[in-house]
Amino acid sequence: MKEKTIIIVGGGQAAAMAAASLRQQGFTGELHLFSDERHLPYERPPLSKSMLLEDSPQLQQVLPANWWQENNVHLHSGVTIKTLGRDTRELVLTNGESWHWDQLFIATGAAARPLPLLDALGERCFTLRHAGDAARLREVLQPERSVVIVGAGTIGLELAASATQRRCKVTVIELAATVMGRNAPPPVQRYLLQRHQQAGVRILLNNAIEHVVDGEKVELTLQSGETLQADVVIYGIGISANEQLAREANLDTANGIVIDEACRTCDPAIFAGGDVAITRLDNGALHRCESWENANNQAQIAAAAMLGLPLPLLPPPWFWSDQYSDNLQFIGDMRGDDWLCRGNPETQKAIWFNLQNGVLIGAVTLNQGREIRPIRKWIQSGKTFDAKLLIDENIALKSL
């Protein structure tokens, strides 16, 4: 019997790891990856950090360059897909080529959620999703330039830190009442706000841009009535899933391709993962997880599901952020206001713990990354703790 053909659409983390996972899990059939980028699949997290800060930055490839040929994966880079061919099982490119598939994995990622008021500035306005975006930013983030960043989420704060380290004068505008309000607990939000302010970043909370005038400098009028002058304007206010191909194929979408917990779409032969995907939970709610690890996890899950293998167990959600000299790692459930702190954040070494009825459900480490491994095991096992012992620095965590 002829082996099936699997096509992967996308060129990022989830796409590359899906190819790797399929081969690792025993798939020996024909495997193709189609991407509109000309680079080999590369790591996205460094774009806001090392790609802006290192003297001679290089893209970090997800897989070694020789891996693709050695594992008989056909790479089609710099191509544009016209249609997925859901009914015909023939993917069609804009150049007229068509490629048969038996199963499809979509990992087309996401674009920056648009902000029309700033998009009208054209090339004077910047977002960060791809290597080319980082290269453009690197050129304009020069010492003493005034930089305005709209959005104080993870990407906004990482860019603020990098721009400050490049000796720019940075102002951050945030509509919400706090920084990283969507994915950090209150004590970590307070720490990060203070950390940036101490570094010289001006952070304007509960504020937004009302009017923009493009001149020698960009003039930004805020809701508060204040006017800012900027050499460089950057924004990061969320994502817009690259779901157009899926919509045109009549797959279920909701600012993301709707998948189940096996990464399967409404078509049993089509799977999706990474930032383009949004999971429908058992209770009907839709949940998106935008992280490097989630892309890896969903690639492994989709590969197993495509091959009819048992699905791997999901670890607790985890992501990290590097800002200035700080490494913060977030694991588990970030909800809730009652967090315990081990250590002193003022010394830039601390761990915040989230206990629910004594059970550890989440944690954030500040420059204590070596502790993530035991914490992950505790969260997975539902381990209970005495709060006083957990925050006592005289007691080694590994002894608890």
UniProtKB/Swiss-Prot annotation:
Pathway: Aromatic compound metabolism; 3-phenylpropanoate degradation. Keywords: Aromatic hydrocarbons catabolism, FAD, Flavoprotein, NAD, Oxidoreductase. The keyword Flavoprotein applies. GO terms for biological process: 3-phenylpropionate catabolic process. It holds the Pfam family Reductase_C. NAD(+) binds at residues 146-174. It is an enzyme of class 1 (oxidoreductase). It catalyses: 2 reduced [2Fe-2S]-[ferredoxin] + NAD(+) + H(+) = 2 oxidized [2Fe-2S]-[ferredoxin] + NADH. It comes from the Bacteria. Its cofactor is FAD. InterPro entries: FAD-oxidoreductase/Apoptosis, FAD/NAD-bd_sf, FAD/NAD-binding_dom, FAD/NAD-linked_Rdtase_dimer_sf, HcaD, Reductase_C, Ring-hydroxylating_dioxygenase. Its EC number is 1.18.1.3. GO terms for molecular function: 3-phenylpropionate dioxygenase activity; ferredoxin-NAD+ reductase activity; oxidoreductase activity, acting on NAD(P)H. FAD binds at residues 5-36. GO terms for cellular component: cytoplasm. Belongs to the bacterial ring-hydroxylating dioxygenase ferredoxin reductase family. This dioxygenase system consists of four proteins: the two subunits of the hydroxylase component (HcaE and HcaF), a ferredoxin (HcaC) and a ferredoxin reductase (HcaD). Part of the multicomponent 3-phenylpropionate dioxygenase, that converts 3-phenylpropionic acid (PP) and cinnamic acid (CI) into 3-phenylpropionate-dihydrodiol (PP-dihydrodiol) and cinnamic acid-dihydrodiol (CI-dihydrodiol), respectively. PANTHER family: APOPTOSIS-INDUCING FACTOR 1, RIESKE DOMAIN-CONTAINING PROTEIN-RELATED. This is 3-phenylpropionate/cinnamic acid dioxygenase ferredoxin--NAD(+) reductase component. The gene is hcaD.
